[in-house]
UniProtKB/Swiss-Prot annotation:
UniProt record, GO biological process: carbohydrate metabolic process; peptidoglycan biosynthetic process; UDP-N-acetylglucosamine biosynthetic process
Record function comment: Catalyzes the conversion of glucosamine-6-phosphate to glucosamine-1-phosphate.
InterPro entries in UniProt: A-D-PHexomutase_a/b/a-I, A-D-PHexomutase_a/b/a-I/II/III, A-D-PHexomutase_a/b/a-II, A-D-PHexomutase_a/b/a-III, A-D-PHexomutase_C, A-D-PHexomutase_C_sf, A-D-PHexomutase_CS, Alpha-D-phosphohexomutase_SF
Family: Belongs to the phosphohexose mutase family.
EC number(s) on file: 5.4.2.10
MF terms (GO), sorted A to Z: magnesium ion binding; phosphoglucosamine mutase activity; phosphomannomutase activity
Entry's cofactor comment: Binds 1 Mg(2+) ion per subunit.
CDD domains the UniProt entry points to: GlmM
Name listed for the protein in its UniProt record: Phosphoglucosamine mutase
Organism for this UniProt entry: Albidiferax ferrireducens (strain ATCC BAA-621 / DSM 15236 / T118) (Rhodoferax ferrireducens)
Top enzyme class: isomerase
Active site feature: S102
Organism taxonomic ancestry: Bacteria, Pseudomonadati, Pseudomonadota, Betaproteobacteria, Burkholderiales
Phosphoserine found at: S102
Amino acid sequence: MTRKYFGTDGIRGTVGQAPITPDFVLRLAHAVGRVLKKSEARPTVLIGKDTRISGYMLESALESGFNSAGVDVVLLGPLPTPGVAYLTRAQRASLGVVISASHNPFADNGIKFFSAQGSKLPDVWEHDVEAALDEPPVWADSASLGKTRRLDDAAGRYIEFCKSTFANDLTLKGLKIVVDAAHGAAYQVAPKVFHELGAEVVAIGCSPDGLNINHEVGATHPQALIEAVKAHQADFGVALDGDADRLQLVDHAGRLYNGDELLYLLVDERLGRDEPVPGVVGTLMTNMAVEVALRARGVQFVRAKVGDRYVLEELEKHKWLLGGEGSGHLLALDKHTTGDGLISALQVLQACVRSGKKLAELLAEVTLFPQTLINVRLQPGQDWQVSANLASESRAVETELGAAGRLLIRASGTEPLVRVMVEARDAVQARACAERIANTLSV
C-alpha cells in the first residue's frame, strides 16, 4: 500500500507548505496518540528536535496534538536523533518523536518516530497513523488531557550513554580532534563527548542560530572539516549532519572517509579481535569494493533498499549486528538500536587507538571503485519510470559496464529528485555513463 505522507525517514518537507504546517502536525500528533491509545491507556511520548527555527513551532503543535489525545509529553530540547531513540528506551516511553529534516537546509523540517524499543517503526505502523489521520479527531475531555514536562538533563544522559560504548581501558588523550556538528542537534553534546574521553577538541559548526544548520558545514559539506583539520594539525576530524545520525571522518592528512569504508573498518576491527561477524548489510548504493573485500574474508554481504530503516530490517531478519550506508549511517546493534554518528565515530577511533594505526593503514585492503552520483530534479508530474528512452539508454549503459560495474536509478525518498549512480573500474567511464542517463532524464 502506498503511503500518503510518510517517506523513507518519516514525514519531511518545506516549512509552511503541506504537510509541514502547524495545523497538520497537530492533527498528526493527535492521530499518533489515538493509535498509541489502542494498546496503552496513558501513553507517554518524548519529543526532541534539532536547531531549526521552525522546531519551536512544530514542537508546540506536536505537544498540543498529543495532549489533546490524552497523551503525556516529555520535552527533551535540542538533541541528536539517536539520543531521542536512546532516551525513549531508557525512560520506558511509549514513543520517541524527532523534529528534524536531517541534512536538509533550514527551510525544511520533518517528523520521525521511534518505537518504545528505540527502533524505527515499520511501514504497517505508518499506514495505521495515516488511516487515523483520515478519521475525525476525538478530543480528550479536560480531566483526560495529557500533561507536559521537560527532562532537563537529557543531553547529559545521552553524553554518558555515548561514552559507555567506548572501551573503559582506552583514552583519547594525546589526540586533537576537530568536531563539526553542522550547527545542528549535536552542537552541545558532540564536543563534550570527545573532551570527556580525553581528547583536545576544536569545535566548528557548533554555533546554531536557527538558520545556519547544515550551511556549508557538517557531513554533507566536509570541506570545512578538511580545512580545519589541516589548519589545526589535528589527528582526526569528525563531521555530523543536522540530527547527528550520520558521520563523515577525516584523517590527519585531510583525506575523507565515507560510510562504506568505515563500515569495513568496523568489521575488520571485530574480526581482528576474533569476534564473529557472520554477515553485514549494506544498500544498493554500497561500493562494490566493500562487498568484494568482505566476501574475501568469509563475511556474507546483503544489500537492502536505500535508507537506514531498511538496513535495520535486514539486520534483524538475519540476526546480524553491523550495517550501514555510504552516506555515513552506520548501525552496530550491540551498541545502539539505530544509527548514531557519535557512537560510530567512537568505534572508529577506538579501532585506531587500540591498533596504534592510522586510518589509511587500517583501510589499506579496500580501494573503492569509482562512483558517480548525479541528482536530477524532476519536473512537476514527470513520470520517469515509464520513459522508453530511459529504458533504452539504461540497457545500453548496463551492456557497456558488464560485470565490472553497476547502474542504479532510484527516486529520492525525501526530495523530488531521481538519483543516478554509476560504478565502474574507471572513473571517466563512470562519469560518462552517469551523464548519459542524467541527460536522458532531463529531456
